[in-house]
């Protein structure tokens, strides 16, 4: 009897997983379809803004900013949906020198960091396996965000080895910090209604999903109170 119940339960679980996967695929196709329909309209608006530039530069500039924001939002929604639908497909790994890699990433971020802010890197010349492209993407996003909200003080990128197969990349700043009421939904998409020209709020959810596909996690260190600290922990 117990065995029969187990088999029946297992069948139900498999059916539920299959339905969930089908729903995800349908959602992805729906979003891609909507986005592809939006693209011609956005391209037309962008062209109109260029034509308007000579006659009314201020209005044209605003229009260009709004069109660019909508295009980015469309791209981000597509990527978010694609990531959600492929979480079990991990990225390919390759070897990097942590110290050299972190220095290069910080060099790319420096153009966004204010002159009153000191950038620093603390990472050893150690070989680790990871997906270089996706790791750089997450860290650059975090560093750029830190640059936006840090007027003075320091922005740092640090590497810590937590075990034979676990390591962390830590981005810390002395900026304004994140209000407590926003911290709970930080990695959840569509939890905040905001002006798209200031950002669509999908950057951290996308980074979190990329981290999951790297066999890791992206978290906010809520115990740090002198600014903001994000911890990207990876398992290899």
Could you tell me what each predicted segment is?
Residues 12-51:
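Primarily the dimerization/phosphotransfer
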Residues 85-91, 127-130:
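Conserved micro-motifs of the catalytic ATP-binding
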Residues 92-95, 114-126, 162:
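Conserved catalytic submotifs in the C-terminal HATPase_c
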Residues 146-147:
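Short helix-loop "hinge" at the ATP-lid/N-box region of the Bergerat-fold HATPase_c
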Residues 154-165:
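Short beta-strand/loop element within the Bergerat-fold HATPase_c
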Residues 178-190:
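Short conserved segment of the HATPase_c
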């Amino acid at each position: 009897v117990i065995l029969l119940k187990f088999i029946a339960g297992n069948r139900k679980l498999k059916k539920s997983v299959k339905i969930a996967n089908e729903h995800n695929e349908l959602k992805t196709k729906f979003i891609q379809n909507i986005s592809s329909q939006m693209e011609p309209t956005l391209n037309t608006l962008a062209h109109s803004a260029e034509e308007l530039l000579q006659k009314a530069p201020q209005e044209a500039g605003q229009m260009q900013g709004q069109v660019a924001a909508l295009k980015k939002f469309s791209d981000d929604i597509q990527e978010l949906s694609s990531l959600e639908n492929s979480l079990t497909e991990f990225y390919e790994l390759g070897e990097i020198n942590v110290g050299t890699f972190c220095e290069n990433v910080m060099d790319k971020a420096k153009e966004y960091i204010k002159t009153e802010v000191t950038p620093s890197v603390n990472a050893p010349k150690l070989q680790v396996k990871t997906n270089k492209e996706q790791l750089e993407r997450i860290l650059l996003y975090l560093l750029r965000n830190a640059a936006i909200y840090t007027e003075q003080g320091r922005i740092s990128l640090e590497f810590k080895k937590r075990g034979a197969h676990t390591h962390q990349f830590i981005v810390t700043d002395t900026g304004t910090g994140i209000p407590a009421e926003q911290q709970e939904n930080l990695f959840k998409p569509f939890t905040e209604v905001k002006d798209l020209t200031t950002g669509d709020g999908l950057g951290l959810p996308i980074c979190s999903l990329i981290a999951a596909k790297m066999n890791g996690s992206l978290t906010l260190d809520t115990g740090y109170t002198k600014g903001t600290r994000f911890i990207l922990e990876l398992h290899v």
